[in-house]
Amino acid sequence: MAIKKRPDADRLPISQRIDSRMPNPGRRQMTPTEWAIKGELFLNCSCELFCPCVVSLGAHPPTEGHCHAWMAIAIDEGHFEGEDLSGLNVGLMVEIPGRMGEGGWRVAAYVDERASGKAYNGILQIFSGAAGGTTGLFTMLVSDIVGAEREKVEIVREGKKRGLYIGRKIQGEIEMITGKSEDHPVMITNSKYWMGPDIIAARGLKSKVRDYGRIWDFGGKSAEICPIDWKGPKP
């Protein structure tokens, strides 16, 4: 019986075979730089009960098996490589297929139309994870940035209510859940959650997303409010 001759390519040294493979497709790379943001983040998601991602640090599945959400970030103080970010607003549309910590996030960003060119690009670097620091984990968790655009991003913070308004694309309103003492909302404190240690529990009121082929309604669903103090990597 004739012995079948192996193709020459199969006899190449392993190192040469590896070198000759097709290159990996492009992916976001982290380029750590100097930045900082202080302010407040609030969101409304598709979970029926208070989001289990907070106390489980992303290890527990969302109540619906997936997580759809909008997020609002009010930057009270901030800068990116010397460019002032104070007073700017950012909105995000987020789609997570399973456990938060398992990645696969799809995200759209809406950046305040008042942002300068450098501020706009800096905000995108921060929220894509490329700038490193607190949000650096996004380079691992976010698989697809479906869009980024300048918009009028209106954020309202009045008493126990919060609102995010981006034209007809996102119209979200949430309200803190009142605790035993009416002066203090229900909250989780001293957590290791990535956003911040103190999370105020809230619920969605009027809350609709209509963009990028998504039609979501989070009225009555889980919401949260978190003071943030994020930074770039330590020098």
Regions inferred by a protein language model and the residue ranges of each:
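Non-catalytic, low-structured ubiquitin/UBL-interacting segments
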Residues: 3, 23-32
